[in-house]
């Protein structure tokens, strides 16, 4: 679920894939559909996979299950496309539907640039000579604006520092040295698809996904790093992802929660809970705008389960 929320946060649309040979919905179906509604994914297609392993009667029964399950969601009137991924059956129809039913939004390139970091890495091979080393790379999707080669960028919350036992996070300033998108070098990058940004950062900072969850923008334009958040909370009636539907109780003070904000994942402790408002102290800070939505998960049994979302006040 953490992976799904992080990736879906930067998407313009989604494919909701179900298997024709099992009953719909499964626990994961409910969880993913609620998550999609929560983060505002409106452009959806339903893909009915594995039609090659069921007969016509079962395929039609599964179609009716899907129609019933999607009532009241953004997928209620979405096309349901039967496919066999293994045999590549109807893939041309699916590609056509993606092009026709998930429109590319009009982008305003004049607004402050934002990129959510999904990956970060060191591209230098072991044994590379010092003079041949290149800076660290951050990868992700540009949410708004555009980035150009030569831009001075800021990365928040940045890296963890420990000065005299006091732990803090320090934002990073870097310069864009290279941009790659669509498998080739580009001079500027805009929203749509994934982009790799080569920087002059020490590669030890970016290696092994060290900057995943950060936000990149032009220096001086990013929102404040938040160590505590006050949230307007909207809880689901039932927790999702469990085999048995479990009623969601109100959030309590001193309760641990896991929060997803864009591609950032952090844990926190509720320091105050009242009515539909919760104040949470975060173990790792996030960089997010007021009004941003944050997914909330609670430990139920042995797993963290999605229970609702909050809007940053």
Task: Describe the predicted segments one by one.
Residues 19-21, 42-61, 80-91, 213, ...:
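G-domain G4 guanine-recognition motif of GTPases
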Residues 27-30, 55-60, 92-96, 128-130, ...:
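Short acidic, glycine/serine/threonine-rich loops at helix termini
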Residues 68-211, 215-222, 227-229:
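Conserved catalytic-core segments of large NTP-driven translation/proteostasis enzymes
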Residues 8, 36, 70, 270:
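Short hydrophobic alpha-helical segments of the AMP-binding
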Residues 1-2, 9-32, 37-60:
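Conserved Switch II/interswitch segment of TRAFAC-class P-loop GTPases
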Residues 3, 31-35, 61-69, 93-101:
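Alpha-helical scaffold elements adjacent to nucleotide-binding pockets in ATP/GTP-utilizing enzyme cores
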Residues 53-58, 202-313:
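C-terminal effector modules of nucleic-acid-centric enzymes and ribosome-associated factors
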Residues 19-23, 49-53, 85, 158-160, ...:
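Short, ordered loop/turn segments at secondary-structure junctions
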């Amino acid at each position: 679920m953490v992976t799904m929320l992080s990736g879906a946060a930067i998407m313009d649309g989604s494919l909701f894939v179900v298997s024709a040979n099992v009953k719909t919905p499964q626990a994961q179906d409910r969880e993913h559909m609620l998550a999609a509604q929560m983060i505002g994914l409106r452009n959806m297609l339903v893909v009915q996979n594995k039609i090659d392993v069921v007969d016509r009667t079962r395929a039609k029964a599964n179609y009716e299950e899907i129609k019933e399950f999607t009532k009241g969601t953004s997928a209620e009137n979405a096309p349901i496309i039967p496919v066999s991924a293994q045999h590549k059956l109807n893939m041309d129809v699916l590609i056509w539907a993606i092009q026709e039913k998930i429109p590319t939004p009009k982008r305003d390139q004049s607004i402050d640039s934002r990129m959510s970091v999904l990956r970060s890495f060191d591209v230098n091979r072991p044994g590379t000579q010092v003079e041949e080393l290149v800076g660290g790379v951050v990868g992700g999707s540009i949410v708004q604006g555009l980035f150009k080669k030569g831009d001075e960028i800021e990365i928040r919350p940045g890296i963890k520092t420990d000065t005299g036992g006091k732990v803090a996070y320090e934002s990073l300033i870097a310069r864009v040295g290279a941009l790659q998108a669509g498998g080739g070098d580009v001079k500027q990058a805009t929203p749509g698809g994934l982009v790799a940004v080569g920087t002059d950062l020490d590669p030890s900072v970016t290696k092994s996904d060290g900057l995943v969850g950060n936000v990149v923008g032009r220096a001086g334009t990013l929102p404040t790093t938040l160590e505590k958040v006050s949230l307007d909370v909207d809880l689901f009636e039932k927790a999702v992802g469990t085999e048995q539907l479990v009623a969601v109780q109100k959030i309590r003070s001193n309760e641990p929660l896991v929060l997803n904000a864009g591609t950032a994942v952090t844990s926190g402790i509720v320091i105050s809970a009242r009515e539909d408002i919760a104040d949470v102290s975060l173990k790792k800070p996030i960089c997010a705008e007021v009004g941003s939505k944050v997914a909330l998960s609670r430990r139920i049994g042995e797993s963290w389960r999605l229970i609702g979302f909050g809007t940053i006040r």
